[in-house]
Structures are given as C-alpha cells and as structure tokens.
Curated annotation (Swiss-Prot):
GO terms for cellular component: cytoplasm. It catalyses: N-acetyl-L-glutamate + ATP = N-acetyl-L-glutamyl 5-phosphate + ADP. The keyword Lyase does not apply. The lineage of its organism: Bacteria, Bacillati, Cyanobacteriota, Cyanophyceae, Synechococcales. This is Acetylglutamate kinase.
Length: 293
C-alpha cells in the first residue's frame, strides 16, 4: 500500500541512488580522501551546509576525510574593515606582515573554527589545525620571494594526522604554515591539499571549485571533460586548453597523482552535495584525473 505522502517514483529513485552508492561505499571504506574546501561552497549557507553533511556522511560510512580550506572572501572582508588594500600578482595574494596577521587570524581563528563547529554539530568529530601545528606543514618562500609571505610547501609531516584518522576524527586544516625560522606564510590551499594527499597516500584528492571542471572550451560548460589520464592532463596544459586559474589546480592534481594518489577530481562546489555526487555515483559531476595504472 502506498502512503498518500509518498510518490512511488520518488521512493524508487531513492532506492536507485542508494543502490548505486553501495559499491563505492564498500570500496572506499577505510580509505582517505583529501578535500580542498573553498569558493562559493564556503560563502553560501545552503552550499556550506551541504558540504558539511557530505563530509559527515563520508565519515559515517567509514571513509576518512581530511579537509583543507582557504578563505579568500573572508580575508578580503577583514582587510577592508582594517583599511588594508588587498593586492594580487600572478593570481596570488601579495602578503606583507600586516596582511599576514589578518590572514592567520581569519583562517586559523575564524574560518577553521566555523568549519569545525559545523562538522561537530553533525557528529563528525572534527579537529581544527593549521599547517604550523605539530609541524604538519613546513613552508618555504614562493618563487623568488617577491610576493612577501606567500609560501609553498617544503615538506609535510603526516604523522600528526595518523592518530586522529585512526580514531575517527576529521582533521580540518587551514593553509597557514611556518617556515624553518618560524615565520608564518600564506600557502595556496590547493597546494597544501595536494601535498597532504600524497603524504597520506590518499585514495582521492578532491578540489571544490567555482567551475564545472576541466573544459575543452572554456566558454562552454557542455565541453566538460569527465575523465583524463595523467598524461592527457599534462598535454592539455601544453596545448593551452587548460589555462588561467585552472592551470595551478590541474598542476596540483598532476603532482599529487605523480606521487601516488589514485585519482584527483576537480568538482563544481556550486552544486549542492557535489562531494557525494562525485564519489558515490557512476557518472560523477566533475573532472576525474587518473593516476598511473
């Protein structure tokens, strides 16, 4: 008997979705997935809630998610309140000492705790960290140092995360880390996520972005490339098909894959529940780049 409150097709669809997800849940149980959380998914409350629920569900079915986050819009908001003009060069925030103070305050003290609190409310048992905690990430100056306190990853110490993951916690990591002299640097969150994924021997690296994925034609969302081999991703950069802001994201994926990560995904964070759709469905919604077979 069908209840008047339920449509048979709706119930059938729910069963279909759960059935499709089952083999992926079984496959990834106990595996590590590093998620870079940023973009529109951090700004809009509905998307933020969907990401938190996705992460909590991943943890509840045995996946071990690790979250790395940025926080550009929030940083810009506080710089404006403090009358500090943000400056960008080559797509990177030029970071002097005053700006670095704000970056560290916002990412470590504000954004990180908002994410931790959101996950904890859903029972995900999140723990907030920065790259500096336990020397998790050691920074070095990016390029020739002309961008100030903008950093790159010198090395990663995954031992800090192992006991947390083994005990069922969800590490939430801000992309601020100190160099060997103890000076804090602002590191691109994609870069931190990629290097952590490699160090943790993660099954997947997932970058939440404000684009559908890698497009063959940047003006056409319909030209989304759903799956690539590592060599094909490199060729797209060489051919100029991947360009602009997508280049560092694709390069981040390539580096992680070259170090042993099984697959890297560039996913549209503007789509609610993008994480679950990419991980637990056959079609996915973004671009998956596969490592060496």
């Amino acid at each position: 008997m069908v209840s008047p409150d339920h449509e048979p097709m709706d119930d059938a669809l729910r069963v279909s979705v759960l059935s499709e997800a089952l083999p992926y849940i079984q496959r990834f149980a106990g595996r590590r997935i590093v998620v870079k959380y940023g973009g529109a998914a951090m700004v809009h409350a509905e998307l933020q809630s969907a990401v938190f629920r996705d992460l909590a569900l991943l943890r509840s079915v045995g996946v071990q998610p690790v979250v790395v986050h940025g926080g550009g819009p929030e940083i810009n908001h506080w710089l404006k309140r403090l009358d500090i003009d943000p400056e960008f060069r080559e797509g990177l925030r030029v970071t002097d000492a005053a700006t670095m103070d704000v970056v560290e305050m916002v990412l470590v003290g504000r954004v990180n705790k908002q994410i931790v609190n959101g996950l904890n409310r859903l029972g995900a048992r999140a723990v907030g960290l920065s790259g500096s905690d336990g020397c998790l990430v050691e920074a070095r100056a990016w390029g020739d140092g002309s961008h100030g306190l903008v950093g790159d990853v010198a090395r990663v110490n995954p031992d800090v995360l192992e006991p947390l993951l083994d005990r069922g916690y969800v590490p939430v990591i801000s992309s601020v880390a100190a160099n060997a002299e103890g000076v804090a640097h602002n590191i691109n969150a994609d870069t931190v996520a990629g290097e952590l994924a490699a160090a943790l021997e993660a099954e997947k690296l997932i970058l939440l972005t404000d684009t559908p994925g890698i497009l063959r034609d940047r003006e056409s969302p319909e030209s989304l490339i759903r799956q690539l081999k590592l060599s094909e991703a490199r060729q797209l950069i060489d051919d100029g098909i991947v360009a602009g802001g997508m280049t560092p994201k694709t390069e981040c994926c390539i580096r992680a894959l070259a170090q042993g990560v099984s697959a890297a995904h560039i996913v549209d964070g503007r789509v609610a529940h993008a994480l679950l759709l990419e991980v637990f469905t056959d079609a996915g919604i973004g671009t998956m780049v596969l490592g060496r077979s």
